[in-house]
C-alpha cells in the first residue's frame, strides 16, 4: 500500500530571519521589492518578512519606516500569507509593555497586512502570551504560538507536550518548535514531534538554525514524525547562523510523500536574484564569513551561536579574551541560579552578561546588571525552576518585593502618554507604536523624516558615486605593464616616517568621518542594556545585544 501523501509546507525566511542572522538585518526594502512577484508564485505556505529585529534595524540603521515596508510587501504578495515574529508581551522590544500597547500593535500589524503572528515568550511563561493571542484572534489573524526549545534537566518531552497543550487550549491555530540555537538533533526531533502530534490536533511547525550543522537532518526527522511546516531560507542567505536552504529541502522531499510541490524553477531564479546581494554583503564586510560555517561549540556548550559571538565581543572590549572558557563554565551555573531559562532574547543576554561580570569581577554577583535584578524580581515572568534564594537575596536584598502575578498586570496603560510625547512628529497612527518600542531611535527617525532625510540622501549620493567610480575603474583600459628590465633601474622610495614617536597630527591632517570603534553586535541591530563598573581600578563596560 502506498504511503499517504502529506506534503510539507514551506515558510520562506529570506526577508526576515535569513538576513537578520547573516547580515545583522540590513537588507533594505528596495532590495526586496524587485523579486517579490516571483516569490509570490512559488507556492510557499507563508513568507516571514517582519518582526524580530527588522523593526529596530529599519529605524536605527536604514532610515526606513518599518510600517511602510510592511505595506509595500503586502501590496506585492497577492497570494502568499505574510508572517511576523512577535515577542509576546515584549512585542518587538526588550521590556514588557502594557496590554493596550500590545493590543494596538497587533491591531495595526494585521490591518497593514500581516496574516500569521508567531508569538513566543523567552521563559515559556504562557501568561505572557495571553494578551497577544487574544488580540490576534480578535483581529482575525492566525495565532502561531512558539515553544522556545532548549536543553536541560527540566526540558523533557513531557514538559514540551504539556506546554503545547496549554497553547492549544488558549486558542493557538498552530504551534512552532522554535529552536533558536540549533540544539535539537535528528532522533530527538523524531521523539518530540511524534509525542506532540499525539498531544495536540493543530498543525506543527519547525524553526531551527544551521549553526550546529544538524538542522537539515533534524527537519527530515521532524517531518517524518509529523511536522507539517518547516522554516527555510533561499540558499544565498541560508546555512551558518541562518536556516537550511529552501531549494535543498524542497529537493530532498521531492518524489516522497512529503513532496512540497512548489515551483523549483522559480526557486532557482529567486536564488539568482539574491546571489549578487550576498556577494555585495561579503565584499563590504557586512556578511562575515565566520557566521557561514558550523560552530560545534553550540552543541558542546548548549548556547546559541549569536550568544557566543556576543561573549567574545564583550571580553575583547575588556582585553580579557583569555577568560572565554571561564565564562563558558560560568554560564550553566548562572543559568541554574536564574531558574534555568531558555537561552533566547532577552534571557540569553542576561545570563551571558552576568557570567562575564562574575568572572571579571572575581566574585559571583558582586555586580549584577539591572536586567539580572529584573529577572530575579519576576519582572519577566515565571521560570521553569525557582531562583537560587541566596543569589536572589544577595542581588536584591533581604526585603525585596517579588512579582508572582503576570508582570503586565502591574503596568498601567501607556498609549495616552506615548501619544502626548510624540506630539507634533506624529504623521500616522503607527508612529506611536514605533516610539513605544524605541523612543530615542524613533524620535531621531521622526526628526530626520520631517527634514526630508538629509543624512540618508547624502549617504545614498556617496554610495552612488563610489559605485560609479568602481564601474569606471572596471571598464577602464588596462595599463601597460612596465618591462621587468626597466623596473630594476627605478630608485627605491624613501622610507615612510609617519609613525614618529611623540608626533601629533594637526586637526586638518585627520581624515573626517572616521568610524568610531565599538563593540560588535553581529546578530542584532541594537542593545537592550549597557552599563559600567570597575575591576582593580580599571573601567569595565558591558553591552547586551539582541540575538533573536
Go through the PLM ranges and name each one.
Residues 1-23, 70-75:
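N-terminal amphipathic alpha-helix/helix-capping segment at the start of soluble metabolic enzymes
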Residues 5-8, 43-45, 78-82, 113-116, ...:
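Short, well-ordered coil/turn segments that N-cap beta-strands
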Residues 10, 18, 39, 119, ...:
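Conserved, mostly hydrophobic/aromatic
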Residues 40-58, 292-297, 306-548:
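Terminal or standalone catalytic/regulatory effector modules within metabolic enzymes
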Residues 51-168, 175, 185:
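Active-site beta->alpha loop and helix N-cap motifs at the rims of alpha/beta catalytic domains
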Residues 119, 179, 225-242:
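Glycine-rich phosphate-binding active-site loops on the catalytic face of alpha/beta enzymes
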Residues 155-167, 212-228:
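Catalytic cores of alpha/beta
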Residues 238-260:
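C-terminal helical cap(s) of enzyme catalytic domains, especially alpha/beta-barrels
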